[in-house]
Amino acid sequence: MSGTRLNALGSSPSKTQKWFRNYAKDLMSSYESSALIQHKVTKGESREYQIFDILDKLLPTRISVKRGVVIVDSQDAESPKFDGVLFDRSLWPLLFQDNDTVVIMLESVLAAFEVKSSLGTRDLQDIFSKAQKLRSMKCMSAGSFFSPPLVTAFAYKCPNRNLAFFDFAVRSQEFPDSTPSLICVLNQALFGLARSDGTTLLRVDQPSAGHIPVMFQTQVDTLLIYIYFLSRWATIGSKTVDTFMKYSDTVFSSLVVFHFDSDFLCSVTSSPSALDKARTCFKGNSSKSINDAYAIARGQIGLG
């Protein structure tokens, strides 16, 4: 339980950290400006463009970042509509293109992408549902990246990070194969997956039974670490991102990772009463640290 610090605390932020923090400020400023737009669809599209523009600027050029993409498999099945897709244009042809609409092969997809203005319970349900449908498609083994593709999401805000992570962890326990690989909450945290080698938590990308839902408590450096993870996906087999990491030793050396213990997750997923009691502890403690809320929740369901 509680937080696992990967290394000792770093000192002053690097130039790279400062640059990415400025990108994050720009994103939040654009988000606040778009709040003045009354038309909901236009407002949502504006916020999608903002984050996709940043990704297009910063990710390796092997990856195309595009909206309006239809993903199909070899059986002619189509994926649900995602806000955007990260896919490989260096090796894979398009199947169809007409103005802003593009049809691509499932095997060319690195990750399907969802954008949320504010991350709540219904948003998480939507992300998991779309991930399940994407992962049920027939993916041939000759893809450029992961088989099946990954799912990631970006949220500008989250009113209760503790509750959101609790919901993420519970759904991940209940539907392991439908779990998104990474959710970014700007300037707050990253929700991801890990496995244990007995003494250490190791980050994993592809969801599977037995994975451990984790929260990287990244705060103002969330965007930097998100770009790092996406770049690592895009450069599989390369040591490029190891070098990228060294440009910000201070942030990576101070990463704290939180996860729930297995007895807690087993209890809340096997008992509706325990689930309700535990969830109330996170719902009513948005201002507390997740460690404190977790300690209260364990007590409420009799785990001490």
Task: Label the model's feature ranges.
Residues S2-K81, L86-G304:
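Intrinsically disordered, low-complexity Ser/Thr/Pro/Gly-rich regulatory segments
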